[in-house]
Every structure is written in C-alpha cells, then in structure tokens.
Regions:
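Short, internal acidic amphipathic alpha-helical interface segments
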Residues: 6-43
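Alpha-helix initiation and N-capping motif
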Residues: 16, 78, 91-92
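Short, highly charged C-terminal tails/helix-capping segments
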Residues: 82-106
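Surface-exposed beta-strand edges and their flanking turn/coil or helix-capping segments
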Residues: 4-6, 15-18, 50, 58-61
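Charged, low-complexity intrinsically disordered regions
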Residues: 35-88
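N-terminal accessory segment detector
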Residues: 1-4, 10-11, 106
Length: 106
C-alpha cells in the first residue's frame, strides 16, 4: 500500500531551500512515513508505504490506525510548512511552533 497526501500549496522558488531544511528536520522527528517535495509541482507531500508480502491484507483496525497516523502527522506539521512558505519563518521557528503542547484546559 502506498499513500501520498498532497499539501495543495506550491512552494515559491525563493522559499525552496528553507522548505527542504524543514522537511529534513520534520523527518528526523517522525518514525513512520516521511515528508517529501513533489518535484514536478513543487508541493509538500507526506508518503507512507506498507509492505504486504504473501497476500497479506491489513485488518480494519490496522488500516484505521494507519489512516489516523497519516492524518495526525499531516495535521501536526502542515502549519510548519505554512509558517515557512507563507510566513517567511525559518525551519527551526516553524518546528517550534508546531510541536508545542498545551497545558491545562479552557
């Protein structure tokens, strides 16, 4: 199974280097799947592969967990790409803004 999630935002040429730095930093933080830049369109993507050999089929629980992981990871780091592409922030600032955790309740 190969799943690709496209972030429908084109990376301007003047932000490409910083987006590549961000992609490397994010990939160092995650264990499953990876972010990449779709070279034809210059768009950030998240890619996930699941190798199933010998006719194996994932259970509903496994597939739902896979989709939840993909969704959670994309939702967590999509703002980082926005901070860099449109906000003009550097990769370090963007990561800090995306991985903070809140304390307490409102």
């Amino acid at each position: 199974i190969h799943i690709i999630v496209f972030f429908e935002t084109k990376i301007p040429e003047y932000r490409q280097d910083e987006v590549y730095k961000l992609t490397i930093k994010i990939n160092q933080l995650i264990w499953l799947g990876h972010f990449d830049i779709w070279s034809d369109e210059l768009m950030p993507v998240f890619r996930y592969n699941l190798l199933l050999s010998g006719g194996l089929i994932p259970t509903d629980i496994q597939f739902n967990s896979l989709l939840r992981h993909i969704t959670d990871t994309c939702e967590k780091f999509f703002p980082s790409f926005q901070y860099v592409i449109w906000g003009g922030n550097n990769a370090d600032e963007a990561i800090k803004n995306s991985i903070f955790t809140t304390a307490g309740e409102s």
